[in-house]
C-alpha cells in the first residue's frame, strides 16, 4: 500500500508514476474523498467537543438546582449526530482504504518504461546454449522414457496441470531443493524456515495477494465469506507466510538484514492462462519453489535486490545452466514491486529462455500493509522496513532445465556434478 501522505499531498506526481505502468489512477475520486474526509473529521471533532462541554454543564446545572432535562435532551441529540458523523466517516475511510489497497506500487526511476514483456531490458547472459548432434527431446518425452513423469496418473488423481513423479526423476527433484537450501543457508546466510501451506486472509492482505488477486488462489471456502477467520487459502508462494513473519513486529535495527528461505509447494489457479503451456511442468497448479526473502533498512534495499538476485543466479551457475538476466519494464512488473529482475533459463526443446526466477524489491509497500517496522537509534518513532523476495529457484522449472540441457543422444539424462552428492553419486538417469 502506498503512503497515504503521498496520495493526499502529491497526487498528481503519484498518478504520473502509476501511468508509466499502465495504471490510471482515479484522481478525481481520491480528491473528492479526501475533501469529504476533512469535512467529516472537523465535524466529528466539533460535535465531540460540544457534547463534552454540554455534558459538563449538566453537573453544574444540577448543583445549582436547575432543570437539567433540556440539557440532557441536547446532549442526547448531539450524541446521535456524533454517532451518525462517525459512522459516515468510518464508511468513507473504508472506501479510501479499499481504493488504496487496489493501487499498485510506484516503479523505481531506474525501471524502463514499457507496456509488456517486449519492452523488458536484457542485462546480461551467462553460459552458452549447448549444440546437439541429435534431435532434441523435451522434458515430457525424457521423463516418460525414464519412467519418471506420469501426467496421466495425475489427471486420474486430480486433473490437468498436475504431475506424479517417480524414481530417479522424483529423486532429482528432491535433490534440487536440498541443493538450493544448502547453498542459501550455508553460503548466502539465509535462515531456513518451515511455514504453513495454508494462510489466513490477513496474511494474504499483508503481501498484496488480496483483495486484488483472490481469483488466483485456492480457498478452503468461498472468498465471499472472508469475514470468517477459519477460511484459509493455499499459499501461491512461500513469500506470503515468510514475509508475514514480521507482520505487526517492531524489529531492532541490529537484527537487520533479516534473510530467510523456505522450500514449499506453491498452489495457483492460473486464472487467465487457459491454453498456455499445457504440456509439461512449465505451468502447474502445484509446484515446488525455494523462496528467498530479505527484510532490510530502506537505504539498503536496492543493494539487497542485487545481492538476492545474485544468490538466485548462483544456483544456475553451479548447475551450469545457461540463462539471461532481464530488468522488467513498468508494464510487466508485479502489483507490489518497485523493481524486478527476471532470470530466464535456456530450454532447448523450446529454443528459448523461460522465466525461472523473479526477484523484486517491494520498498515499503508490503511493510505498510503489515505494519512491519524497525527501531532505529536515530529516530524516535519506528520506521517501516523494506521487503524483498525472489525464487531461488522454482524447483520444477529447474528440473525441466536440467533434464533438457543434460540430455544425451540415447535419452539418458546426465546428473550435474553439483547434484551428485545428493543422489548417492549417480551420474546418469535412464
UniProtKB/Swiss-Prot annotation:
Annotated protein name in UniProt: Serine--tRNA ligase
Major subcellular location class: cytoplasm
Species assigned in the record: Edwardsiella ictaluri (strain 93-146)
Database matches in PANTHER family: SERINE--TRNA LIGASE (PTHR43697:SF1), SERYL-TRNA SYNTHETASE (PTHR43697)
Binding positions for L-serine per the UniProt entry: 237-239, 291, 391
CDD domains: SerRS_core (cd00770)
EC number of this enzyme: 6.1.1.11
Positions of ATP binding: 268-270, 355-358
Region ranges (Disordered): 44-65
Catalytic activity: tRNA(Ser) + L-serine + ATP = L-seryl-tRNA(Ser) + AMP + diphosphate + H(+); tRNA(Sec) + L-serine + ATP = L-seryl-tRNA(Sec) + AMP + diphosphate + H(+)
Keywords: Aminoacyl-tRNA synthetase, ATP-binding, Cytoplasm, Ligase, Nucleotide-binding, Protein biosynthesis
Description of its domains: Consists of two distinct domains, a catalytic core and a N-terminal extension that is involved in tRNA binding.
Enzyme class: ligase
Biochemical pathway: Aminoacyl-tRNA biosynthesis; selenocysteinyl-tRNA(Sec) biosynthesis; L-seryl-tRNA(Sec) from L-serine and tRNA(Sec): step 1/1
Quaternary structure and interacting proteins, as annotated: Homodimer. The tRNA molecule binds across the dimer.
Similarity field: Belongs to the class-II aminoacyl-tRNA synthetase family. Type-1 seryl-tRNA synthetase subfamily.
Family matches, as InterPro entries: aa-tRNA-synt_IIb, aa-tRNA-synth_II, aa-tRNA-synth_II/BPL/LPL, Ser-tRNA-ligase_type_1, Ser-tRNA-synth_1_N, SerRS_1_N_sf, SerRS_core, tRNA-bd_arm
Protein's GO biological process: selenocysteine biosynthetic process; seryl-tRNA aminoacylation
GO cellular component term of the entry, any: cytoplasm
GO molecular function: ATP binding; serine-tRNA ligase activity
Entry's localization field: Cytoplasm
Function field: Catalyzes the attachment of serine to tRNA(Ser). Is also able to aminoacylate tRNA(Sec) with serine, to form the misacylated tRNA L-seryl-tRNA(Sec), which will be further converted into selenocysteinyl-tRNA(Sec).
Amino acid at each position: 500500500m502506498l503512503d497515504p501522505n503521498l496520495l493526499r499531498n502529491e497526487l498528481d506526481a503519484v498518478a504520473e508514476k502509476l501511468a508509466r505502468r499502465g495504471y490510471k489512477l482515479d484522481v478525481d475520486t481520491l480528491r473528492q474523498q479526501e475533501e469529504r474526509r476533512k469535512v467529516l473529521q472537523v465535524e466529528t471533532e466539533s460535535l465531540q467537543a460540544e457534547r463534552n462541554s454540554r455534558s459538563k454543564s449538566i453537573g453544574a446545572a444540577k448543583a445549582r438546582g436547575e432543570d437539567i432535562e433540556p440539557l440532557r435532551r441536547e446532549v442526547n441529540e448531539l450524541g446521535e449526530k456524533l454517532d451518525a458523523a462517525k459512522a459516515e466517516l468510518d464508511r468513507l475511510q473504508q472506501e479510501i482504504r479499499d481504493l488504496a489497497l487496489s493501487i499498485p506500487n510506484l516503479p523505481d526511476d531506474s525501471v524502463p518504461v514499457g507496456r509488456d514483456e517486449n519492452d523488458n531490458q536484457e542485462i546480461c547472459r551467462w553460459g552458452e546454449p549447448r549444440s546437439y548432434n541429435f534431435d532434441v527431446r523435451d522434458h515430457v518425452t525424457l521423463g516418460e522414457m525414464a519412467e519418471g513423469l506420469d501426467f496421466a496418473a495425475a489427471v486420474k488423481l486430480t486433473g490437468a496441470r498436475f504431475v506424479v513423479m517417480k524414481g530417479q526423476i522424483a529423486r532429482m527433484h528432491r535433490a534440487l531443493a536440498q541443493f538450493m537450501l544448502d547453498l542459501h543457508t550455508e553460503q548466502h546466510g539465509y535462515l531456513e524456515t518451515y511455514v504453513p501451506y495454508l494462510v489466513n486472509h490477513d496474511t494474504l492482505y499483508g503481501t498484496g495477494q488480496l483483495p486484488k488477486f483472490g481469483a488466483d488462489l485456492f480457498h478452503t471456502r468461498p472468498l465471499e465469506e472472508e469475514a470468517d477467520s477459519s477460511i484459509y487459502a493455499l499459499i501461491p508462494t512461500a513469500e506470503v507466510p515468510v514475509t508475514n513473519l514480521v507482520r505487526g513486529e517492531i524489529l531492532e535495527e541490529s537484527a537487520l538484514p533479516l534473510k530467510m528461505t523456505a522450500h514449499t509447494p506453491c498452489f495457483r489457479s492460473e486464472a487467465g492462462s487457459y491454453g498456455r503451456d499445457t504440456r509439461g511442468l512449465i505451468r502447474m497448479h502445484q509446484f515446488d519453489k525455494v523462496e528467498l526473502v530479505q527484510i532490510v533498512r530502506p537505504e539498503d534495499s536496492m543493494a539487497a535486490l542485487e545481492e538476492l538476485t545474485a544468490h538466485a543466479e548462483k544456483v544456475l551457475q553451479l548447475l551450469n545452466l545457461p540463462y539471461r538476466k532481464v530488468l522488467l519494464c513498468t508494464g510487466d512488473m508485479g502489483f507490489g514491486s518497485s523493481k524486478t529482475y527476471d532470470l530466464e533459463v535456456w530450454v532447448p526443446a523450446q529454443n528459448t529462455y523461460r522465466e525461472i526466477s523473479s526477484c523484486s524489491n517491494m520498498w515499503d509497500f508490503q511493510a505498510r500493509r503489515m505494519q512491519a517496522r524497525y527501531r532505529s537509534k536515530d529516530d524516535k518513532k519506528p520506521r517501516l522496513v523494506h521487503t524483498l523476495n525472489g525464487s531461488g529457484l522454482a524447483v520444477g522449472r529447474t528440473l525441466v532445465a536440467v533434464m533438457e540441457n543434460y540430455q544425451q543422444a540415447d535419452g539418458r539424462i546426465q546428473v550435474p556434478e553439483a547434484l551428485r552428492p545428493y543422489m548417492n553419486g549417480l551420474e546418469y538417469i535412464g
